[in-house]
From Swiss-Prot:
GO terms for biological process: bacterial-type flagellum-dependent cell motility. The keyword Signal applies. It comes from Vibrio vulnificus (strain CMCP6). The gene is flgH. It is a lipid-anchor. Belongs to the FlgH family. The lineage of its organism: Bacteria, Pseudomonadati, Pseudomonadota, Gammaproteobacteria, Vibrionales. Disulfide bonds: none annotated. A lipid is attached at residue 16 (N-palmitoyl cysteine). NCBIfam families: PRK00249.1-2 (NF001302). Keywords: Bacterial flagellum, Cell outer membrane, Lipoprotein, Membrane, Palmitate, Signal. This is Flagellar L-ring protein.
Length: 259
C-alpha cells in the first residue's frame, strides 16, 4: 500500500512540473503580436465634445498598448539532492555578454534623426496662331459683298502661361529614450517598444518609439542608434494648452476646407 501511495505521489509531482507556466494578468492584457509595433488602436475613442471639435484625441500616459511586458514567471522545479554545489539554473556562458536578448530587457535608443526635403517645379507654356487671307479677285476686280466687304481676313491669337512652385521641409530630433524588449523573433531580432512622458506647467510632452533591432547592432554600452531600428515608429508630440495653440480651430479648418 505504501508503494502504491509513493508511486501516485511521484506521478502527481511529475505532472505538476510539466504544466505550462501561469501567465500573469499583465501579460494576458498586454498587446498581441499583431499590434506589438503600432499599438492597439481598437479602443481609441473621443473623450468628449472638446476632442470632437478639435478633431483629435490626446494620448494618455499608461496606455495598455504601450505598457511594458515583463518576462513570464517560471515555475519552481524541485531538483533532487545530489550533494553538489553546481546548479543548472544558474549556468551562464563564460564568453557571453550582457546585451539584451529576452523579453523585458532594457535598451537605450539614441535619437538622431534629420530629414530634409525640397522640391521645385517651373512651367512656361506659350502658344500663338496667325492666320490671314488676301481678298478674292474675279477678272482683276476684288469680289465684294454689298460693295463694301471683301473676303479677306487677318486673325492673331496668343496664349501664355507661367507657373512656379517650390516646397521645402526639414525635421530633426535628438535625445535618448529607454525602451524594453517585448518580443524575440525566430531569427533572433528583437521587437522593442517604449514611451517617455514629461510633465510641464501647461501640458505634457511624450516620446514614443517602437521597431525591430538586431542584437549585433547594440553597442557595448547597451545603446543603439535610431537609424538602426527597422520599421521604426517615432512620435514626439504633446498635450495641453501649448499643443492646442499650435493647431487651427475647428472653424478655421471648416472654412479652409469649404473654400
Amino acid at each position: 500500500m505504501k508503494r502504491i501511495s509513493l508511486i501516485a505521489l511521484v506521478t502527481i509531482m511529475s505532472g505538476c512540473t510539466m504544466l505550462e507556466p501561469i501567465e500573469t494578468p499583465e501579460v494576458v492584457n498586454a498587446t498581441t503580436v499583431v499590434d506589438a509595433v503600432e499599438g492597439d488602436k481598437s479602443k481609441d475613442e473621443s473623450s468628449g465634445i472638446v476632442d470632437t471639435l478639435r478633431g483629435r484625441s490626446d494620448p494618455v500616459a499608461g496606455d495598455p498598448a504601450w505598457a511594458p511586458i515583463h518576462p513570464k514567471q517560471q515555475p519552481e522545479h524541485y531538483a533532487a539532492e545530489t550533494g553538489s554545489l553546481f546548479s543548472v539554473n544558474h549556468l551562464s556562458n563564460l564568453y557571453d555578454d550582457s546585451k539584451p536578448r529576452g523579453v523585458g530587457d532594457i535598451i537605450t535608443v539614441t535619437l538622431d534623426e534629420k530629414t530634409n526635403a525640397s522640391k521645385s517645379a517651373n512651367a512656361d507654356l506659350s502658344k500663338s496662331n496667325d492666320s490671314s487671307m488676301d481678298p478674292l479677285e474675279v477678272g482683276g476686280q476684288e469680289l465684294k459683298i454689298d460693295g463694301k466687304y471683301n473676303f479677306s481676313y487677318n486673325l492673331t491669337n496668343s496664349n501664355n502661361f507661367t507657373g512656379d512652385a517650390s516646397a521645402k521641409q526639414s525635421n530633426s530630433i535628438s535625445g535618448y529614450i529607454t525602451v524594453e524588449v517585448i518580443e524575440v523573433l525566430a531569427n533572433g531580432n528583437l521587437v522593442i517598444r517604449g514611451e517617455k512622458w514629461l510633465t510641464l506647467n501647461t501640458g505634457d510632452e511624450y516620446i514614443r518609439l517602437s521597431g525591430t533591432i538586431r542584437p549585433d547592432d547594440i553597442s557595448f554600452d547597451n545603446t543603439i542608434a535610431s537609424n538602426r531600428v527597422s520599421n521604426a515608429r517615432i512620435q514626439y508630440s504633446g498635450t495641453g494648452t501649448q499643443q492646442d495653440m499650435q493647431e487651427p480651430g475647428f472653424l478655421a479648418r471648416f472654412f479652409n476646407v469649404s473654400l
